[in-house]
């Protein structure tokens, strides 16, 4: 997969600035609600019908019964009916700004840009702020060319929980909270408890928060050496970093946080370091065209997860270090993969095509005996529209190609340590600390292999209508499947799955 970003061009330095502003709201009247008077009338009719058909009352007595009981179901506050949609939703807005500078000469080209986005959501306290930057530089010197790319971003998102529990119920309460409920006390302060479940979503909104911050950086450097004419040697190093932090707070005044407040912090971090060494050759000899490549690749990935929670705060400074009691959970995983690969493509007159590829991958997710897997493919194509015997129909059939391919690829286990015995310390049974098995070793686990062949036909008529036909068959062998494991032996995987991956069965698909 090749991702191309914006780059500079030879010529004068170009400075560009753009900005835009806008507004947003609900596109439709989602879940239309009755106003207070209409709801009161509907409930009054229901009470009257109850008296008529259940209490066997006369029409007049049923109406009196409804008048006597309507205040219990749809009383009108002295301040008027409450429009919860109006209180909880608003018109959102956004503003975007972008500045870029680019330029260069015959040896050096550069491009850099910064951008800022600020959005206010249609729910109060909901919004997003994003800052991004991008820079790339290309410089040629002698037989060398160096390319440097750097991208980074920081996103801060204020969220609101749309659940219907005490964990910050905001949005959903707009659709089933009674207009008879009053969110404010007589002195103008927020009412702590009203309506359905005794929850005031405005009060909960002010005493809870959910902030997610994501920081990402992607940096690459590539050095290319022109050994001879069409023969090039390149080395590329890429580092990808991402860290997301989610801070969720229910203070001591909220329903969920009472009486001492609860704060949770979840941190996810992903690091990936990739290297690519490639020797490539691209050339043409008359009608003969060759594209060949040899490569060596490495991938080093690390994932870290941290969960921290604090509660019983003595005051209103909600940081984990101030909590009366804390708990934590951590998880760290990593894996590496090394690959050797080769590819060769040949075509004659852009009419007859032949392609070959081969690679062997070694993954740390498998035991040493089964770590390496070899995969290959062969393909061919015939652009028959260029044949002279089709000249009479070329005014209608403007393009045609026949394709055929066969290949083998592999899938590694999703679990980083499926081949190893794993143990975990912690509270295991009846509140007692101890150690349990959380991973049963399977040193025989190996690559899942997919063998696929395909035949296809591409047709184009009068340069306007394109038709593609494909038929394929794929057979998967050594299928990786999570096999149930007996709990009698004390196995505990932490997710109550009680499974271990095995290579069992095969699968065939065609279509």
Where on the chain are the PLM-derived regions?
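Residue-level signature of outer-membrane beta-barrel architecture
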Residues: 5, 103-105, 116, 139-141, ...
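Outer-membrane beta-barrel architecture
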Residues: 16, 100-102, 113, 136, ...
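Short glycine/threonine-rich loop-to-helix capping motif typified by GTGT followed
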Residues: 368-372
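Outer-membrane beta-barrel initiation region
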Residues: 87-91, 101-105
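Transmembrane beta-strand segments that form the barrel wall of outer-membrane beta-barrel proteins
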Residues: 19, 114-120, 354-363
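Surface-exposed loop/interface segments of Gram-negative outer-membrane beta-barrel transport/assembly proteins
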Residues: 9-80, 121-128, 132-216, 234-338, ...
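A beta-strand signature from Gram-negative outer-membrane beta-barrel systems
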Residues: 1-18, 94-96, 109, 115-120
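Short glycine-rich loop/turn motifs
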Residues: 98, 274, 337-343, 351-353
């Amino acid at each position: 997969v090749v991702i191309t970003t914006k780059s500079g061009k030879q010529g004068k330095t170009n400075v560009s600035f753009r900005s835009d502003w806008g507004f947003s709201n609900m596109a439709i009247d989602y879940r239309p609600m009755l106003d207070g008077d209409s709801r009161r009338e509907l409930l009054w009719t229901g009470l009257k019908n109850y008296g008529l058909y259940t209490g066997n009352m006369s029409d007049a007595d049923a109406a009196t019964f409804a008048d006597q009981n309507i205040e219990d179901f749809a009383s009108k506050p002295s301040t008027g009916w409450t429009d919860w949609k109006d209180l909880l939703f608003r018109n959102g807005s956004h503003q975007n700004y972008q500045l870029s500078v680019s330029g260069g000469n015959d040896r050096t080209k550069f491009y850099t840009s910064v951008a800022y986005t600020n959005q206010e959501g249609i729910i109060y306290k909901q919004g997003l702020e994003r800052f991004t930057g991008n820079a790339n530089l290309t410089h040629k010197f002698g037989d060398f060319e160096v390319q440097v790319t750097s991208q980074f971003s920081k996103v801060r998102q204020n969220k609101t929980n749309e659940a219907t529990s005490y964990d910050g119920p905001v949005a959903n309460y707009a659709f089933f909270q009674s207009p008879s409920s009053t969110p404010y006390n007589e002195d103008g302060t927020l009412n702590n408890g009203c309506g359905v479940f005794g929850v005031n979503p405005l009060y909960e909104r002010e005493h809870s928060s959910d902030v997610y911050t994501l920081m990402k950086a992607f940096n690459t450097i590539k050095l290319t050496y022109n050994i001879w004419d069409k023969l090039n040697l390149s080395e590329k190093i890429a580092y990808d970093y991402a860290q997301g932090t989610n801070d969720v707070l229910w203070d001591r005044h909220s329903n969920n946080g009472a009486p001492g407040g609860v704060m949770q912090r979840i941190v996810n971090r992903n690091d990936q370091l990739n290297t690519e060494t490639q020797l490539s050759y691209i050339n043409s000899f008359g009608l003969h065209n060759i594209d060949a490549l040899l490569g060596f690749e490495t991938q080093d990935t690390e994932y870290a997860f941290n969960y921290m929670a604090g509660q019983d705060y003595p005051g209103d400074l909600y940081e984990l270090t101030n909590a009366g009691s804390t708990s934590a959970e951590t998880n760290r995983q990593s894996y590496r993969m090394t690959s050797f690969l080769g590819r060769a493509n040949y075509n004659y007159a852009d009419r007859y095509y032949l392609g070959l590829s081969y690679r062997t991958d070694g993954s740390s997710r498998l035991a040493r005996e089964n770590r390496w897997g070899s995969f290959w493919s062969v393909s061919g194509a015939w652009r028959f529209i260029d044949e002279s015997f089709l000249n009479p129909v070329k005014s209608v059939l403007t393009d045609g190609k026949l394709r055929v391919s066969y290949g083998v690829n592999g899938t590694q286990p999703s679990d980083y340590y499926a081949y190893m015995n794993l143990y975990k310390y912690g509270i295991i049974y009846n509140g007692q600390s101890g150690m349990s098995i959380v991973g049963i070793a399977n040193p025989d686990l190996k690559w899942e292999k997919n063998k696929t062949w395909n035949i296809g036909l591409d047709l184009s008529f009068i340069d306007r209508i394109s038709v593609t036909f494909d038929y394929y068959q794929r057979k998967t062998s050594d299928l990786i499947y999570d096999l149930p494991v007996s709990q009698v032996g004390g196995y505990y995987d932490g997710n109550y799955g009680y499974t271990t991956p095995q290579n069992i069965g095969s699968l065939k698909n065609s279509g």
